[in-house]
Each structure stands twice: as structure tokens, then as C-alpha cells.
């Protein structure tokens, strides 16, 4: 998180969100520090519907098993900062299972989960695209 991003988010209501890979981010492998997580949680966006999309794709992919990277909980950080609805965190097992066999999960505030369920009730899980080739 840079001061420039914070400034833009605070001034420009057309900025509706940010997508983050907080652990082992490609291509550098960076893991967000506790300070960076807190800066995200304390954002004061101009857009009332601004969201952080926290793609925790590598949550179980520790590069160093004896010294796993510790990533603070963004959901708690946002709730403690007074922004419980600002973040959606998601992950999947697609990188640790067979192709097409992965499952995914989402974590969010109660209000955000209610909103997601309204949309998801019209969705279907289609066939595995990889095996259709």
C-alpha cells in the first residue's frame, strides 16, 4: 500500500475497489506486513461502495514450512477499524488439487454475505471447463 493509492482512494469516488494478493504475491513473493494490512483496514474511501478484494490464493502455500509467513486477519482489522463491510476475502484449493477438482470459499461481513446470497441464488455451477476441451 502506498500513500499514492491511499490518496487516490480517498479523493476519487469513481475508484470502487482494489484487488490484492496479500501472501506470496506474484511475481515478487511479497507478504503484506501487519502495517500494510492495517493501512488497508483504515482506508477512508470517497466511494461508499468501495471494496477490498483480498485474494488469499496462497493461504496454505508456505514457502518455508519451518517459518510460515504470518498474515494478519483483514476481516478483523476492517471490523476493528469501523469498516466491516469493506472487504471480501476468498481462496480456493485449485492449486493444491487435481485440475477441475478445486473448491473455493469466501469470507465477509454478515451484510456482505447476505448480498452475495441474493446474487448466488441465480447462479449455477457448470461443468468443469478444463475437462470439456
Task: Outline where the language-model segments fall.
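PLP-dependent class I/II
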Residues: 1-133
